[in-house]
Amino acid sequence: MTLQVSPAWASDPGPSNALPGQDTATPVLVEGIREPVDAKAAPADAARQHLAANKSRYRIPRAGSDLVPLAATATGSTDETVRLQQKHRGVPVLGGQYVVRMQKQDGKRVVTGTSGHYFTALSTDVTPQVTEDVAVRRAVAATARRLGAALDKGQAPRSESGDPAATGMTGEAKGLVVLPKGAGVLAYRVTVRGTAPGTGAPVVDEVYVDARSGYPALQYSALKTMAAPAVPAAGEVAESPTADGPPAAPANLVPETGSGARLSGAAASLDIAYDPAAGSYLLADAGRMRSTSKSLLSTWDARGKSVSETSGRWPSGITMFSSPNTTFGAAATDSGAVDAHWNAGQVYDFYKKNLGRDSLDGNGGAVNSLVGVTYYGMPYANAFWDGTKMVYGIGDKEFKPMSADTDVVGHEMTHGVIEHTANLVYAGQSGALNEALADYFGNAIDVTANGTPMGDPTAGLIGEDLCRTKAAADCALRDLNDGATTSKSFLGVSFATDNGGVHLNSTIFSGALWDMREDLGGALADKIVYKAVTEYMTPIDGFTEARGAVLAAAKALGATAGQQNVVKRSFNAHGIVPGWEQALGVDTDTLFGKLNTTDSGVGAGGGWWTASKSNDDGSEPYSVYAGRLDGKGAPKVISPNDGRYHTAPATDGKTVVWTAYGPTSVDVLSRPVAGGPIKTLYSSVTGVAGLRVEKNTVVFEEYDIIGGRHVGYLRPTDKAPVFTDGKKWNTLTALPSISDNKIAYAKLYPEAGSYRLGVEVVDLATGKAVMTEQLDEPVSLGQTGINGKNVFWLSDTDESDGGLTSVISSGLDGRGAFIVSSEHKPGAFVASDLTVSQDALTLVAQTPDTRYRNESLPKLWQLTTDGSRRERVSCNRGEQSYPAAGAGRQVTWLDATTGSTDLVVRERPAGTC
């Protein structure tokens, strides 16, 4: 997020030991001070008094009212750290946290430094114009779009009255927040939970809906996973009821020592408890926190429970692992329970003994681990922290249960530590920092608990002990010694891909920290990183701010000049230096830079492009622009500046059409490229997508209130849209395209007591509709494309192959279907979008891979219409999305390589990369 700078304040640099913030008047880091403050006041009051007394430095005009205490912690006998939450006119500011560090000794207290983000340019009004119900509905719809546009058999309607959970998701409003963009954007925070259509994967999204227009301005997944491997789709499986919290622990537990075998074969001594009432022994450590909070470290039997039942909730009837004696046998070993329990104890001890932290929350809170979790009864090889507990998958043929490796358990539990301290937002650079810190401490705990030397070749590997047959290097999920740097490794992606690169880019930062640990040793390095996380970092820090936090923490801990140089050298070696984002190169021509938009695509036709853009700091609602594909001339504004979000435009070179998000409706608007009046073509209370235009005929799809999708079209003579499916409750149509007065779309329709998928072509001149031939029975259909000769579409006929997709084509009469690219042959794509010209078709596609990396990101591939040739459109390093075909082989798209989203173009494919 970028901020509005205040020129008058920015001209005053402040003290030499203050590091200026980016586009804000408040410094992000102040160190090297010892300024007296009231020793008798509460820590939070003393901290705010210091900020108020130094307005010329901090530029915080109302510290007493605009900064609300979040937490005050003491370290050792003298150090105090206070975290303060910024509020704007009483509304919390996302990422607005400021930290004040103090020392108190001999009846005196001094401030030693500050850090964080306070946004000085906020001026937005905090009165919403959108109702909470509208915000929730649009958040759920936005999440459904994020999860994929394909029309899937799993979306088949069940009843005419509608299923309230037809989308598989529900939203819960969590109140208003201010997004710190420019003058600020007032938004509803909505948490969307449920399961992904088609796959059933767990969904927990945080969606921030603009409270004036109702547009989803920010969105990311809140599930902090160990990795993001592809999982096969599964059929429906009945779930057990769920509860909001864990069952009550038995009373009068007696601490005992037990034993069990780890999955590695090593014997483990286990801290357990005897339950006198049941006469059995539990994997409940009642000893570690017995003298303080009396909380438990508990390991729960979640075998037979699906991941969707455990994400953000507790399966009803779940119990702790138990045994009739102190020896826990094969069931506890094979499920990963022994490993989870032993490893959780190691993590607790590491934080307690080495860093003085009592449990994940720092206050002796309970630690809960669920093991044996499946993917709807199928193997599940992942693990995650859901905000309250650790959840470990049962594994699969190659991967053991995910609790089998100490670094995985350390990683997930460290997410809990971060959530209770820096609380780094799990998206973009701050999310990559979250992952990097979890990896660093996970590995630090692993090598400490298992006695692995730092010089061991496996010391920097994450998850290397999870595999049953693969060697450590081949098994590892990540490698902190992979040499990743910002200049050669940073991958620009949208929040729709890996939450903005939280795993993709994490080893750039974790690698620097690991280098530092190798050179300084664990005793000092771990303290430096921990101090940086708990006392310096704040929720939306990026790599540069985090570098400053680590350097400041090293200095505060008394690191020598030589040791501080080691820290600097470690970051420099990984390219983490101020301004590193400017050093990334591309092989494309930029038509329109730094769009700062979310979930808004691109249109092209007749030699023109159209796209939406916000202002430089992303605070303004989007406007629609149009320009020439040859780059000549300046882009022109097409949409009005009326407070609505103008998004997802399309053009044929004569007319631009787009959607406008307002407080009560989503409107379809149009305007000639040459200028003229803006027309409102249609208003929807639910939502519109997939706009296309040709000679003033517009085609789109509309969502209904129960999650259904219906394709409609408007000809110049039509007073209202004609819906191809009549908006029947039992028929869905989606993903339209238009060419030569014909439209094509995917269709899900009832037949012989079941549902079938097909692609239908309608001749708008005659009204005749034909269903194209199907070469196999698809379970999912993707985007259609049509030109003057053929119709093309994406098809998936095998839901067990990880999303591999075929490209199918047929004649406009529905006959002569053939496979352009097969999902069953080597080199098959995982395709998500398609655009066609007369000469070529271009896909957004991923190639199957076992881990996230540049090669497996969404990239543009261009195929000849007969499939005889396939080439990469661009070798840019980063995500490529929303392609729109120009003439011949020309393509324009949104490219995220540089870390911002740019509209770029190529006249022909790059070929082989």
Segments from the language model and where they lie:
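Repeated scaffold domains used in trafficking and secretory/extracellular systems
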Residues: 591-604, 641-653, 684-696, 728-740, ...
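Extracellular zinc-dependent metalloprotease catalytic-domain scaffold
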Residues: 168-173, 177-181, 189-204, 211, ...
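Blade-level signature of beta-propeller repeat domains, shared across WD40, Kelch, NHL, RCC1
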Residues: 868-913
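Multi-bladed beta-propeller domains
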Residues: 582-595, 630-643, 673-687, 716-732, ...
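Segments that shape or occlude catalytic/ligand-binding pockets
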Residues: 7-236, 242, 365-385, 757
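Structural motif
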Residues: 615-627, 663-672, 701-715, 747-761, ...
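Beta/coil-rich, acidic/histidine-enriched accessory regions frequently appended to metallopeptidases
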Residues: 543-623, 630-635, 639-647, 676-678
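Residue position within the beta-strands of beta-propeller blades
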Residues: 607-614, 656-659, 698-702, 743-747, ...
